């Protein structure tokens, strides 16, 4: 199980490292395009790209810190750490969206002809393709195992690619109809449409992460799967004392306390608990399963005294 997490962690880190490289290159290219042009969409994209790059860098550093640290140190805190990073990404996207909206409304109230956008148009076109490619890669990672960091990054890159595609379209139409009056409003209007995408992504990221920031028991559907698994393995234990579950970010933790008759050999008890653990891992992939076994008292073993069952 540990090796599986390590491989998954390396895959996530590799995806983020690739994304960071493209982000840094994009900042340089968009910075050059903004210098050559007076386009609001290009300038606003530069501001957004700086925020995106910071968010990707923070996510990458978080995963590296977790991988470098001792496993037991981050056993429960990793979920909170992932969600805090996701919330930070949402806040950065919100701040960038507000800045873009302010500049867009200023440009609508005081229209200005856009010049020198050819290089920016090329950059937007290329990076819209790159953005959709990276987003698709990260969505594939999410299908293997959910992670708040990767979920926020996938949404961020989908939003970024859509924004770049809109900006490329707006700049292309502005060049095509540069002699028409309405072309003066295409640039700021495209920026406002991009703001809507950014606000939606920021809300989705923050709402999902805030809900997971506080540890909580698993939802009823997953608890039912645990009970169904225990029912199928009814002969593998003599008493069920307690079930405790929790979700911390992308990680699921299940703790079972089972009772066994004193005459059962320890080797048999170990085999029984292992069968239950394997069955639970099949219905809860990637979950951390802990099963503790205790000997029944003599009264319990002959059926005279029942035990208390708790599920949390």
Describe every region a protein language model picked out.
Residues 18-30:
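The first (N-terminal) embedded transmembrane alpha-helix
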Residues 2-18, 35-37, 41, 45-312:
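Alpha-helical transmembrane segments and adjacent TM-loop junctions that form the membrane-embedded core
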């Amino acid at each position: 199980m540990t090796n599986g997490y390590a491989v998954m962690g390396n895959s996530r880190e590799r995806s983020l490292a690739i994304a960071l490289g493209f982000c840094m290159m994009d900042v340089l290219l968009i910075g050059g395009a903004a210098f050559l042009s007076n386009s609001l969409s290009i300038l606003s994209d530069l501001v957004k790209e700086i925020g995106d790059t910071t968010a990707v860098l923070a996510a990458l550093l978080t995963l590296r810190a977790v991988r470098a640290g001792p496993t037991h140190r981050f056993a429960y805190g990793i979920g909170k750490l992932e969600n805090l990073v996701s919330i930070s990404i949402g806040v950065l996207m919100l701040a960038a969206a507000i800045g873009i909206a302010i500049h867009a409304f200023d440009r609508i109230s005081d229209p200005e002809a856009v010049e020198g956008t050819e290089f920016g148009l090329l950059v937007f076109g290329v990076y819209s393709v790159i953005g959709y490619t990276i987003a698709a890669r990260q969505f594939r990672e999410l299908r293997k195992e959910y992670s708040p960091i990767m979920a926020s990054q996938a949404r961020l890159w989908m939003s970024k690619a859509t924004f770049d595609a809109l900006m490329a379209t707006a700049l292309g139409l502005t060049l095509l109809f540069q002699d028409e009056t309405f072309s003066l409003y295409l640039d700021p209007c495209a920026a406002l449409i991009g703001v809507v995408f950014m606000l939606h992504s920021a809300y989705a990221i923050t709402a999902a992460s805030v809900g997971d920031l506080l540890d909580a028991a698993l939802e009823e559907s997953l608890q039912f799967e645990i009970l169904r698994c225990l029912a199928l393995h009814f002969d593998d234990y003599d008493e069920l004392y307690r079930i405790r579950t929790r979700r911390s970010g992308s990680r699921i933790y299940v703790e079972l306390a089972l009772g066994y008759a004193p005459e059962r050999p320890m080797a048999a008890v170990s085999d029984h608990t292992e069968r239950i653990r394997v069955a639970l891992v099949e219905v809860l992939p990637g979950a951390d399963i802990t099963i503790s076994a205790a000997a029944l008292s003599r009264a319990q073993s002959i059926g005279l005294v029942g035990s208390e069952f708790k599920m949390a």
